[in-house]
C-alpha cells in the first residue's frame, strides 16, 4: 500500500511535470537553431510531402548523369509490387585499398526520414567539396529505399505484411532476399542501417 501511494503521489507528478511545462521558444532557438544548410533533395524542393519513389529515381538519375565517373546504379531486385530496388555504387578508381561501406535506408515505409537523410548524404558526397577525398578511402554501396511498397503508402510493412527489419533470418519477403543478396555480393566491411 505504501509503495502504491509512493508511486502515485511522488513519481507520477515528477513524470507529468515536464509535459505540463514545455520548453520555451527562447531555449529552443538558443540550443536547437534551424540548420543553415541547403538541402537539395526532392522533398525539400516541393511544398509538402516526402520524396516519392519516382521523384527519388529522377533525383538519383540526375546525380548519376552529373557524376558518372564516381557513381553507378544497379537494381538488386523488385519489390512485391514490381518496383525496381535501386543500389548505388560510389567509387573513385585509384590504387588505394579501400574500406567497403554498405548503407541501407527506407526499411520501414512509415519512417521516411531515413530515405530523406540518405538522399541528402548522397547529394553531399557528390556535390560538397568537403567530401571530395572521401571516395579515395572508401567504396560505398547505398540502397536508398528498401521497402518501396510500404514507403509509397506510408506503411511500416512490406506488401505481404512482414516487417522487413524482422525478416533478416527467415527471408520470407522478396525484398529481404534481394537486400541479403546485395549485401553479400558487395562484401561490406562496415554496414549502416540508416534507420
Question: What would you call each of these model-derived segments?
Answer:
Residues 4-5, 16-195:
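M14 metallocarboxypeptidase catalytic domain recognition
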Amino acid at each position: 500500500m505504501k509503495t502504491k501511494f509512493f508511486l502515485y503521489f511522488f513519481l507520477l507528478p515528477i513524470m507529468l511535470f515536464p509535459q505540463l511545462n514545455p520548453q520555451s521558444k527562447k531555449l529552443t532557438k538558443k540550443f536547437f537553431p534551424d540548420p543553415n544548410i541547403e538541402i537539395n533533395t526532392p522533398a525539400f524542393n516541393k511544398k509538402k510531402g516526402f520524396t516519392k519513389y519516382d521523384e527519388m529515381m529522377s533525383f538519383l538519375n540526375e546525380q548519376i548523369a552529373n557524376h558518372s565517373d564516381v557513381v553507378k546504379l544497379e537494381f538488386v531486385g523488385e519489390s512485391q509490387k514490381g518496383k525496381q530496388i535501386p543500389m548505388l555504387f560510389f567509387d573513385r578508381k585509384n590504387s588505394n585499398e579501400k574500406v567497403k561501406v554498405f548503407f541501407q535506408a527506407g526499411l520501414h515505409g512509415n519512417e521516411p526520414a531515413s530515405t530523406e537523410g540518405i538522399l541528402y548524404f548522397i547529394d553531399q558526397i557528390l556535390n560538397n567539396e568537403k567530401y571530395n577525398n572521401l571516395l579515395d578511402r572508401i567504396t560505398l554501396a547505398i540502397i536508398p529505399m528498401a521497402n518501396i511498397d510500404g514507403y509509397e503508402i506510408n506503411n511500416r510493412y512490406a506488401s505481404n505484411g512482414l516487417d522487413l527489419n524482422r525478416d533478416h533470418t527467415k527471408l520470407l519477403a522478396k525484398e529481404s532476399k534481394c537486400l541479403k543478396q546485395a549485401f553479400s555480393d558487395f562484401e561490406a566491411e562496415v554496414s549502416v542501417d540508416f534507420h
